[in-house]
Amino acid sequence: MSKQVEHTPKEYIQIKGARVNNLKNIDVDIPKNKLVVITGMSGSGKSSLAFDTLYAEGQRRYVESLSSYARQFMGRMNKPEVDYIKGIAPAIAIEQRVITSNPRSTVGTSTEIYDYLKLLYARIGKTISPVSGREVTKDSVSSVVDFALNLEEGTTVTLLAPLIPSHGRKLKEELSLLLQKGFVRVVYGDSMQKIEAIIDDKAIVNKDLQDGEVLIVVDRVRIEQDDDTVNRLSDSVQTGFFEGKGELYMEENGQRHHFSHKFELDGITFEEPTPNFFSFNNPYGACRRCEGYGKIIGIDPDLVIPDKSRSVYDGAIAPWRGEKMGEWLQVLVKSSLKFDFPIHRAYMDLTAAQKELLWTGNKYFAGLTQFFEELEAQTYKIQYRVMLSRYRGKTDCPDCRGTRLRKDATYVKVGGKSITDIVLMPLEEALEFFKTLPLVGNELVIAKRLLAEINNRLQFLCDVGLSYLTLNRLSNTLSGGESQRINLATSLGSSLVGSIYVLDEPSIGLHPRDTQRLISVLKSLRDVGNTVVVVEHEQEMMEAADYLIDIGPEAGINGGEMVFAGTYQQILKDTKSLTGQYLSGKSQIEVPKKRRPWSNSVTIKGAHENNLKGIDVQFPLNTFTVVTGVSGSGKTSLVKRILYPALQKSIGNYSGEQTGVYDAIEGDITQIEQVEMVDQNPIGRSSRSNPVTYVKAWDEIRALYANQAPAKAAGLKPAAFSFNVEGGRCDVCQGEGEVKIEMQFMADIVLPCEACGGKRFKQFVLDVHYKNKSVADVLELSVDEAIVFFADQPKILAKLQPLQDVGLGYVKLGQSSSTLSGGEAQRIKLASFLIKGNNSKKTLFIFDEPTTGLHFQDIKKLLKSFDALIALGNSILVIEHNMDMIKSADWVIDIGPEGGNKGGKLVFAGLPEELIHCKDSYTGQFLKAHLKD
C-alpha cells in the first residue's frame, strides 16, 4: 500500500473509505485510461465497488452538474457510502440485463444502424416497379433543361403540355381559358392550330374532351448555350409541368420525348422515398395491418399443424379432424390428384408452395384461410368461438410477413436489395454487402458518410461476437450477455472519450473462441482515452488486463476487503489471493475420476427451430450433461425453445409457451416427473423477500418463537412473528425496518424506521427471546451463525444446512433479495431443491450458464450441489461455455460448428475425453488445455 501514497488524482481514481454493502472501509486506487479487472468470489463485494461506488458516484456527479430542470428527467442517484473519490470522470454502466421490453425495439433501432439505413435508402434508393422491373424516375425542371441543352446547338424544340380538362367543361370553355392565360396555339388531331381558329369551328368546339387529346404549345425555343436560353427554358418547362398536371412533351426533329413530374410507371403512382417511409415506428411507413409490430393476434400455424411429422391424410391439420370438420379435409383428399398434391407426405417435407396452397386453396378445395374466415363469420355460435380461441396466437402479419413496413417500401432497392432484405441478413452478411456495395459518382458522395457509420457499427457488433444476429431481432428476446454486448458496440459507435466504462461480465454467453475479439474491443475503448473497469472471472480477460483488483478473501461478511491490487504476473505469486492460487494452478477444480454411466434418455427428433438443421439429439438422464457451442450456434433454441416446452407438454405442465419446430420427442419421458428452469433472476419481487423466507425456514422459526412461554402468555400466534402481515410487525414501516423519504430533484433518502429502530417488529414481539435473541436478532445472523444457534432444532437445521452446502454460509438470514447477486439467487434456488431431498419428484434441472458471476471457488461448490441433486435421482442439463464445467460433465453435446446459418448441426455427443479429438469442435480445441491434468 505504500506505493499508493504516490498516486495522484491525475493518473488514478482514488477511492477512500468505501463502505457500500459489505465493503469494509477500503481504499482503492484505479489507474486511469487502463483496462482494469475487478475479480473475487460471488458476493465478495465486486459489484458494490464497481457499480454501487465507482459508477454511482461518477454518474451522480455528472447529473448534479446539470440544471434542476434537466435533473427532474434523470434517474435520481444515491450518494455512495464513501469518504471521498478523487479523479473521477462521468461513468457509463453497461450491465448484464435486457434493457428494454418494448416490442418495437430491435437490434437495428437500439444500435442506431436502422436510422442510418433509413437515410441511405431515402437518399440513394432506386424504386423498382414490381410490374416491369424498371426503375421509377421523376423528371424535374433542371433535368428537362439539361436534356434540351445536350441537343445539337441550333435545334428548335417545341414544349407541349397535355390539356387536362376540368370536370364538366367543354372544349370551348377550356380553349377560352387558355387564350386568357396568353397561349396562342395547340396541337389537335396531329396538327398545330391557332386556338382562335378552333373556337370558330362549331363542329368540334362543343364536344367532350379526353385527357391529353389536346396539347398546349407552351413555347418554341432555339437551343443556344447562353443564360437567356437557360432561363427561358426553365420558365417554360415549369409552366408546362403546371398546365399538364405534371406531364410535358418535347418535340425536336419529328421526335417527341415524354417527361413526367410524377413518380409513376406502369400505371402505378409510387411514393417518393423519405426516411419516414422506412420507419415502422411512424404511421406513414408502418404496415397498415400490424401497425409496425410485425405480428398480429391471428391464427397460429403451429397450433393448426402441431405435429409436422404427420401427413395431411394422417391428420396433420388439427381443426380438420373429427366428423363435421373432416368434411373440409375430404374435399382436399378427393381432389388432390387433379393438382398433384402429396397427401401422404409428412407436412415438414412439403415444399413452401405446397404448404402455402394448404392455406390459400384453389378452385378444387377451400384452404385453411377460407375455413377460418367462415368460422369468424359464425362467431355468434359458442362452439365456433371456442374452436377459434384454440388456434389463436401471435403470428407473423400476413400483409408485411413480419417485416413491419408497408409493402411498397420493399420496392426501393440499394445494390439490388430492399431494406427488409438487409434487416433479415445475419450481421456478418450485411457487413459484407455494404463493404462491397458498388456505388459511383453522385451516389458515392451522398452515401459515403452514411456507409462509414453503418459499416463501423456492424463491424463492432461482429467484433463483440454477435455476427449471427439480424437487425430485425427483437431486443427483448436477447440474452443478458447479448444485450450487454450490443450496448458495448453502441458505446463504441458513439466514440465517447474521457469516460469510465463499468462492465458486468461482458464475456457471459461468449465462447472462449470469441473472447479474444471482445478483449480487443475493450482495448480499443481504452486506447481512445477511456478507463474501462470490468467485473470478470474469465481467465483470458484477467491475462489481458493492465491492472487487477481482487476483492475478498471470501464472500458476504467474510469479504469486502481488498486482497490484491496489481498486474496479472504479480497475482500469480500472491499467496493470500484465492484468485491467484487458481490462476497459477496451485488450486484447481479437479477432473472427475470417473463419469456416471447412463441407460435412460430423452431424444428430440428433427429439431428445426431457428438455425437448427433438423438434428436428432439424445439427452441422457440421471447424469450431468452440458450443451456447448459457439455463440449463436443453436444451443438455446434446442434446449429452451424445444426440449423444455416439449417436456412440459409431455408431462402435463404446459405453461402456454410456444414450442419450437421439431418432429418428435421420444425416450424415457416417464422417468421425468418435473422440469425446472433454474435462472439467475431475483428470488423475490419485493424487498421483503429474503433467503430465510424463500427456503421456508422462517415458518419453523416463527413456530419456535410462538412456542416460548412469554409468547404463550401473551397469546401470540406464529403470524405475530411475520413481517409480511399485520399484527406483530411495526405499523410505521410495515415490517421493512426502514422508511423512504422522497426528495424533489435529489435521490430518495432511506432511513432506519424511528418507531422500531430498524427492528421490523413491535416491542411486545421483540420481548420474546429464544437463547437471549429476539426474532430481529435472528434475522441479522449469517447462515453459518444460525446453524450453530439452532443446532438443537433439527427442522430448522434441515432447511438451513443446504444454504451452507451451496456456499452461502455468509449470507444473512434477513438480507433483502434485491441485494443478492445473480449467482447467489441461483444457489438459493438450488438449496430449496436440495431441502426437498428424496421427497421431491424426479426432476430434470435446466441451467442456462450457471457460472455467470461465479469465481473458480464458487464453481467448485456449484458442482458439489449438482452431484447432490443427481444423487437424489435427478438429472442436470446445462448450457455452458465454462471449461471447468465442461470438463466435469458426464456427457457433452456440442452444437455448431459456427454461429447463425453456419451452425445448427450436431458436431459431437459423448465424453469430454473424446471431445478433444473432434477436429470440427472449437470447444474441443479449448478443452484440451483443461484435460491435460
What are these regions (language model features)?
Residues 1-933:
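Conserved phosphate-binding elements of NTP-dependent enzyme cores
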